[in-house]
């Protein structure tokens, strides 16, 4: 995928970010479903409108996404994307065809192509998120998801109503890679700008980008 940082840059950035997050994001006012997928983590940059998937501490894939057009926040009814440490609480859509439309998390039977005119439903897969911090603990009740969107032309800029949108094939790919319980860290800043404290001697494996 064009416009993404180089693999080495992403590797160093992810180490720095995860180290910083581990020091600041798990205080005494935190909540967690516990258990589940502890090997995969996702870092979502609001500034970059990109998601980095990290497996066992190594970045494996980057995706173009879209967060809320109303900004960031946790207030009910605000349609904002929450910041902080979230977790995948439920996975919905096993085996659904690419482009399958969901309404209240149930398939309607309709299938849409990317950029279908005049349509903006939840499609393909749903990763229902829960908050793990006092500030974002209402995330599950607010029904904040990572989900597919037919409006793929708008990915890379804020366009959602609070959820984290992905292209249909990308969200299906992510869905197959991670399990319930995986952490999702939503940050204001850029992934690249947080790389300075990383270990520059770390080795980098091959990363699959699209």
Give the predicted meaning of each segment.
Residues 48-50, 85, 126:
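Structural motif
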Residues 22-25:
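C-terminal motif of bacterial Sec signal peptides marking the signal peptidase cleavage site
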Residues 33-57:
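Post-signal peptide N-terminal segment of mature Sec-exported envelope proteins
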Residues 29-33, 37, 75-78, 96-210:
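Exported/periplasmic cell-wall-interacting domains
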Residues 64-96:
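Electropositive
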Residues 2-14:
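Bacterial N-terminal signal peptides that target proteins for export
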């Amino acid at each position: 995928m064009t416009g993404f940082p180089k693999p080495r840059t992403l590797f160093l950035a992810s180490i720095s970010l995860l180290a910083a997050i581990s020091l600041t994001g798990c205080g005494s006012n935190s909540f967690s479903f516990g258990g589940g997928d502890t090997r995969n983590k996702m870092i979502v940059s609001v500034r970059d409108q990109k998601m980095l998937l990290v497996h066992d501490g190594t970045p494996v894939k980057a995706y173009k996404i879209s967060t809320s057009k109303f900004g960031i926040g946790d207030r009910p009814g605000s349609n904002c994307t929450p910041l902080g440490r979230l977790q995948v609480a439920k996975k919905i859509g096993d085996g659904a065809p690419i482009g399958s439309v969901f309404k209240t998390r149930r398939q309607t039977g309709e299938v849409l192509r990317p950029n279908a005119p005049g349509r903006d439903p939840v499609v393909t897969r749903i990763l229902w998120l829960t908050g793990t911090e006092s500030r974002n603990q209402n995330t599950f009740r607010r029904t904040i998801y990572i989900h597919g969107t037919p409006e793929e032309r708008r990915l890379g800029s804020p366009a959602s109503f609070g959820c984290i949108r992905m292209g249909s094939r990308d969200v299906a790919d992510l869905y197959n890679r991670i399990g319930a319980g995986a952490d999702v860290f939503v940050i204001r800043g850029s992934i690249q700008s947080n790389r300075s404290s990383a270990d520059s001697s770390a080795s980098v494996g091959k990363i699959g980008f699209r």
